C-alpha cells in the first residue's frame, strides 16, 4: 500500500470515527445552498494551543471559548461576497454560489472540517485509483486564517487538488508548490512583511531592538526570517530575543509561566533598546500586555506582526497608549461599499434550496453571541478600514471569476456542468481582474501581490484607530509615503533605539562586544577616508595621487608641484644656462678658428671639441628640468647630464695626466710614453671612463625605472611632488661619487704640474674647475641627504649648470682670453721659448 493510499484510509477512518453533530438550520450564517459550494474556515472562537484536546479523539466545542470578533467579521465578508456575486448579472449569471463555513477554533478544529469538505453527501470518502472525476462536497475552500491551520488543511486538500485560498496565512512554507500545489493566498508572504518591518526600522534609524516570539511555529518561523534578513545588513541588531509563555485556555498563568514572563519584563526594563518587535498570535498577548501595564512601561515602540496589528480587543486596552507607540504591518485598506451594514444585519430568509445539494451537518456551526459582540465593536471595525476583509472578499471573487471562465459564461447565462476541483484550480491560477480599483492576479508562488500598510494605533475617538503611516509594495520591495506619525514621546520626537549613537562623517566604527551595532567611533587620520557604503569599520587609504584631511569621507587630488618657468630659482638657473650655452658656443667658434695655433693644441687640440660639444648639448638640455617630469626628461636627468659631465671630467683628467707625462715621465719611461701615444691613450681613457659611466647609468635605470612618479611632500601632505623615480636620488649620489673621484684625480695631476712652463701650467685653472666641481658635488650630496621635494630638483639643476660653467669658463675661458687679447703669445716661437726656459731651470 502506497503513502497516498494509507493517507486516504486514515482520512476515511477519521471521518467515520469523529462524532456527528446535531441538526443544522437550513440557511444559517454558516450555510447557504447553491449550485456550487465554497468551503469557509474561520476562527470565531479563540483557544490557544494546548495538548489537552489532543489526548483523545474528540472535536472541541469552540463555543466554549472566547469569541473572536475579527474571525466573525471575516466570515461575514465571505457571506457578503457570495451574496453580492449571486446578485450580480455579469458574473456567473444564472448560477447560485453556496457556502459551508466552519469555526476552526483557531488551531483546535482543522482535520474534521477538511474531511467534511472532502466527503460526499453520504459522509463517505471512497478510496479510488483516480480522483480526477471525484466531486467533493465543495469546489474550493477559503481559509483558514493562520499558517499552522492552513498547512494542516492543505496537507489534506492537496491530495485532491481542491483549490484553497487563504486570506491571512503568510508562512513562506506555503510558497513551495511541490508540497502545496493547490494552495493560494490573497496576502503577501512573510518575507514581505519582514522586509516592510526592516525598512521601517532603517528609516527611523532604530538599530537596537528586542524580539519577542510565541512558542509556536508562527513565532519561530517569523523570528527566523527576521534574523536571516538582518544578517544581510549590519544596520540592525537584536539586543535579546525571548519566547513568550502561552497560557492555557483559561488565560490564567501557572507560576512557572509567570516567572518566565517576569524575567522577560525585567530584561526589557533594563535594556537600552526601545523598539520591541512581537511575533505572536493575539491570543498569547492579552496576558503579556496586562503585565506590561502592571510594570508601568513607557516610551517603547511596539511593532506588531500582522497577526495582532489590527486586533480590536487588544486595542480596546486603552491604557496601552501610556506604554509608547504601537506600529504594525497589515494588508492595505480597501473600503467595501455596503459591508459595514451587512455585518450587523439580521439574517433574512435565504435563497431557495436548489436540488443539486443536500443539507448536511458539521460541528462548530453556531455562534449565538457573534452578532451582538460584533455590533459592540462595529465602530472600530468600520474605522479600521476593513483591511483583512478585502483579502477574504477578493478570494471569493477569484473563485467566482475562475468558475465564470470554466462554465463558459456569457452576459446572460452559464453552462452548468460538473466542476472538478483540479479544473477550477487551473482557472484560478490564471485569473486577472479588477476589483474595487485593484488589479488582482496570482504570481508564480500563488501569492496575490497586494500592498502592505504600516499602521499606527490611535485612541482618539475621532480618528482611525489603525492609521496608515506608510505603504510597502511587494513588487518594488520599497517602503514609501512615511508620514503622519504621532509619537507618544515628549515634544512628539522620534524615539531613539540605538546601542551606539551614529558616528560623525569620517569616523569609522570599532566594534564593542559581539553586536556590530555596538561600537565606538574613531577618527579617520589624514591620508585615509571612510566609505560607509563599502566598509564602515575601516578607514581606507587614499590613492597615491590623492590626499585627505582628518575625518574626510572622500579624497581629493593633491596639488602637483614641480619646477615652473615663472619661479625665481628657475629664472636664475635659466639665465646661467643661457650664459653657459652662448659662452660655450663662442668658445667652440674661437677654438675652431684658431685650431692650428699652439694655444689650442696645448689645451688638448681635438679633445677640446670632445669637451665642448657635450657642454653645449648639456646647456641646451637644461629645460628638461622644468615642467612636469616625463620619461624623456627623467632619462636626461639620470643619464644624459651625468655622462656629459663625466666626459668633460675625464678629458680634463687625462689632459692633466698627459702634460705631466710629457715633462716629467717621458725621459724616465720613454717606452711607456711611446706606448701611450702610439695607441691613443687619452682617447682610450676617455672612452673607458665613459663606458663605465654608461654601464652604471644603465644598471641604475634597469634596477629602478625612468618613469616619473608623484611623491608626498613630507612637509605638506597636500602637495604631491612630481619627480623621477625615488631611487633616482640614490643613483645620482652614486654617479656623483664617481665624478668626485675624477675631480680628485684631475686636481692631483694638475697639482703635480704646477712647476711646468707657464703656457702648459694649467694647475690653477684645473684646480679651480675641479675644486668647484668637488665642492658643489659634496654640497649636493649633503643637501639631498637632508631635504626632499622640489628643492632637490632645483639644487640638482643648479649644481649641474654651475659644474658645466666651471669647466667651460674656468678651463677654456683663460685660453680664449689669451687667444683674443694676447695673440703674440699664441705663437710657436713663444711656446718654444717657454719650454727652453723650463729646461734650463731644471738642468
UniProtKB/Swiss-Prot annotation:
Gene3D superfamilies, per the entry: 3.40.50.2300, GPCR, family 3, nine cysteines domain
Gene Ontology biological process terms, A to Z: detection of chemical stimulus involved in sensory perception of sweet taste; positive regulation of cytokinesis; sensory perception of sweet taste
Glycosylation sites: 87, 296, 316, 355, 372, 432, 484, 491, 531
UniProt subunit comment: Forms heterodimers with TAS1R3.
Family in the record: Belongs to the G-protein coupled receptor 3 family. TAS1R subfamily.
GO MF terms held by the record: G protein-coupled receptor activity; sweet taste receptor activity; taste receptor activity
Coiled-coil boundaries: none
Signal peptide (from-to): 1-19
Keywords, alphabetical: Cell membrane, G-protein coupled receptor, Glycoprotein, Membrane, Receptor, Sensory transduction, Signal, Taste, Transducer, Transmembrane, Transmembrane helix
Transmembrane segments: 571-591, 607-627, 643-663, 683-703, 732-752, 765-785, 790-810
Gene assigned in the entry: Tas1r2
One Pfam family recorded for the sequence: ANF_receptor
GO cellular component, one term: sweet taste receptor complex
Ranges of the Extracellular topological domain: 20-570, 628-642, 704-731, 786-789
Tissue expression remark: Abundantly expressed in circumvallate and foliate papillae.
Function: Putative taste receptor. TAS1R2/TAS1R3 recognizes diverse natural and synthetic sweeteners.
Entry keyword annotation includes Signal: yes
Cytoplasmic domain ranges by topology: 592-606, 664-682, 753-764, 811-843
Membrane topology: Multi-pass membrane protein
Keyword Ligase carried by entry: no
Source species of the chain: Rattus norvegicus
Protein name, entry field: Taste receptor type 1 member 2
Source taxon at top rank: Eukaryota
Amino acid at each position: 500500500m502506497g503513502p497516498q493510499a494509507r493517507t486516504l484510509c486514515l482520512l476515511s477512518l477519521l471521518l467515520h470515527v469523529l462524532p456527528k453533530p446535531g441538526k443544522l438550520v437550513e440557511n444559517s450564517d454558516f450555510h447557504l445552498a447553491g449550485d456550487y459550494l465554497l468551503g469557509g474556515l474561520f476562527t470565531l472562537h479563540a483557544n490557544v494551543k494546548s495538548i489537552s484536546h489532543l489526548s483523545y479523539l474528540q472535536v472541541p466545542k469552540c463555543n466554549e471559548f472566547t469569541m473572536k470578533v475579527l474571525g466573525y467579521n471575516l466570515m461575514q465578508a465571505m457571506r457578503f461576497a457570495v451574496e453580492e456575486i449571486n446578485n450580480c448579472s455579469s458574473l456567473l449569471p444564472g448560477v447560485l454560489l453556496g457556502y459551508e463555513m466552519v469555526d476552526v477554533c483557531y488551531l483546535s478544529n482543522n482535520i474534521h472540517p477538511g474531511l467534511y469538505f472532502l466527503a460526499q453527501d453520504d459522509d463517505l470518502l471512497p478510496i479510488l485509483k483516480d480522483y480526477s472525476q471525484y466531486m467533493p462536497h465543495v469546489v474550493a475552500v477559503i481559509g483558514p486564517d493562520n499558517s499552522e491551520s492552513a498547512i494542516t488543511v492543505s496537507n489534506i486538500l492537496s491530495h485532491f487538488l481542491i483549490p484553497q485560498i487563504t486570506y491571512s496565512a503568510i508562512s513562506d512554507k506555503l510558497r513551495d508548490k511541490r508540497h502545496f500545489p493547490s494552495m493560494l493566498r490573497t496576502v503577501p508572504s512573510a518575507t514581505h512583511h519582514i522586509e516592510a518591518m526592516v525598512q521601517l526600522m532603517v528609516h527611523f534609524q532604530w538599530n537596537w531592538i528586542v524580539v519577542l516570539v510565541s512558542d509556536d511555529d508562527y513565532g519561530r518561523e517569523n523570528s527566523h526570517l527576521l534574523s536571516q534578513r538582518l544578517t544581510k545588513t549590519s544596520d540592525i541588531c537584536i539586543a535579546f530575543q525571548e519566547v513568550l509563555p502561552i497560557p492555557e485556555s483559561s488565560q490564567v498563568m501557572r507560576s512557572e509561566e509567570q516567572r518566565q514572563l517576569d524575567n522577560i519584563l525585567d530584561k526589557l526594563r533594563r535594556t537600552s533598546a526601545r523598539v520591541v518587535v512581537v511575533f505572536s498570535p493575539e491570543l498569547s498577548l492579552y496576558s503579556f500586555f496586562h503585565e506590561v501595564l502592571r510594570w508601568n512601561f513607557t516610551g517603547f515602540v511596539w511593532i506588531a506582526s500582522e497577526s495582532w496589528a489590527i486586533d480590536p480587543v487588544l486595542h480596546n486596552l486603552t491604557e496601552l497608549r501610556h506604554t509608547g507607540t504601537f506600529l504594525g504591518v497589515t494588508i492595505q485598506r480597501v473600503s467595501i461599499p455596503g459591508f459595514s451594514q451587512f455585518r450587523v444585519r439580521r439574517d433574512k430568509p435565504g435563497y431557495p434550496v436548489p436540488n443539486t445539494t443536500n443539507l448536511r451537518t458539521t460541528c462548530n456551526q453556531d455562534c449565538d453571541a457573534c452578532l451582538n459582540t460584533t455590533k459592540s465593536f462595529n465602530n472600530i471595525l468600520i474605522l479600521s478600514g476593513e483591511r483583512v476583509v478585502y483579502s477574504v472578499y477578493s478570494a471569493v471573487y477569484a473563485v467566482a471569476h475562475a468558475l465564470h471562465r470554466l462554465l463558459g459564461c456569457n452576459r446572460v447565462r452559464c453552462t452548468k456542468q460538473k466542476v472538478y476541483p483540479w479544473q477550477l484550480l487551473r482557472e484560478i491560477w490564471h485569473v486577472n481582474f479588477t476589483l474595487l480599483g485593484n488589479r488582482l492576479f496570482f504570481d508564480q508562488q500563488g501569492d496575490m501581490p497586494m500592498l502592505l500598510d504600516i499602521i499606527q494605533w490611535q485612541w482618539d475617538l475621532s480618528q482611525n484607530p489603525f492609521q496608515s503611516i506608510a505603504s510597502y509594495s511587494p513588487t518594488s520591495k520599497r517602503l514609501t509615503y512615511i508620514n503622519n506619525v504621532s509619537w507618544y514621546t515628549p515634544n512628539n520626537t522620534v524615539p531613539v533605539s540605538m546601542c551606539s549613537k551614529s558616528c560623525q562623517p569620517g569616523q569609522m566604527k570599532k566594534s564593542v562586544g559581539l553586536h556590530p551595532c555596538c561600537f565606538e567611533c574613531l577618527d579617520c587620520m589624514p591620508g585615509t577616508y571612510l566609505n560607509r557604503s563599502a566598509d564602515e569599520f575601516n578607514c581606507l587609504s587614499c590613492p597615491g595621487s590623492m590626499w585627505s584631511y582628518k575625518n574626510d569621507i572622500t579624497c581629493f587630488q593633491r596639488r602637483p608641484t614641480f619646477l615652473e618657468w615663472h619661479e625665481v630659482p628657475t629664472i636664475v638657473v635659466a639665465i646661467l644656462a643661457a650664459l653657459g650655452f652662448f659662452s660655450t658656443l663662442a668658445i667652440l667658434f674661437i677654438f675652431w678658428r684658431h685650431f692650428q695655433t699652439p694655444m689650442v693644441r696645448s689645451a688638448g687640440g681635438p679633445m677640446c671639441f670632445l669637451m665642448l660639444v657635450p657642454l653645449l648639448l648639456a646647456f641646451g638640455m637644461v629645460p628638461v628640468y622644468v615642467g612636469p617630469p616625463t620619461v624623456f626628461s627623467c632619462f636626461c636627468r639620470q643619464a644624459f647630464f651625468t655622462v656629459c659631465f663625466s666626459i668633460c671630467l675625464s678629458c680634463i683628467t687625462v689632459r692633466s695626466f698627459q702634460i705631466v707625462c710629457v715633462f716629467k715621465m717621458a725621459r724616465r719611461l720613454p717606452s711607456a710614453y711611446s706606448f701611450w701615444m702610439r695607441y691613443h691613450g687619452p682617447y682610450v681613457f676617455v672612452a673607458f671612463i665613459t663606458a663605465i659611466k654608461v654601464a652604471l647609468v644603465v644598471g641604475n635605470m634597469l634596477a629602478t625605472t625612468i618613469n616619473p612618479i608623484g611623491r608626498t611632500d613630507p612637509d605638506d601632505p597636500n602637495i604631491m611632488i612630481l619627480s623621477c623615480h625615488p631611487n633616482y636620488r640614490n643613483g645620482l649620489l652614486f654617479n656623483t661619487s664617481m665624478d668626485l673621484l675624477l675631480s680628485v684625480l684631475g686636481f692631483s695631476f694638475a697639482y703635480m704640474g704646477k712647476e711646468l712652463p707657464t703656457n702648459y701650467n694649467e694647475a690653477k685653472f684645473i684646480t679651480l674647475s675641479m675644486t668647484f666641481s668637488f665642492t658643489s658635488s659634496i654640497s649636493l650630496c649633503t643637501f639631498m641627504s637632508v631635504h626632499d621635494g622640489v628643492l632637490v630638483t632645483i639644487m640638482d639643476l643648479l649644481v649641474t649648470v654651475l659644474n658645466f660653467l666651471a669647466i667651460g669658463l674656468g678651463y677654456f675661458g683663460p685660453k680664449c682670453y689669451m687667444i683674443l687679447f694676447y695673440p703674440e703669445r699664441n705663437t710657436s716661437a713663444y711656446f718654444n721659448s717657454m719650454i727652453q726656459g723650463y729646461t734650463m731651470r731644471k738642468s
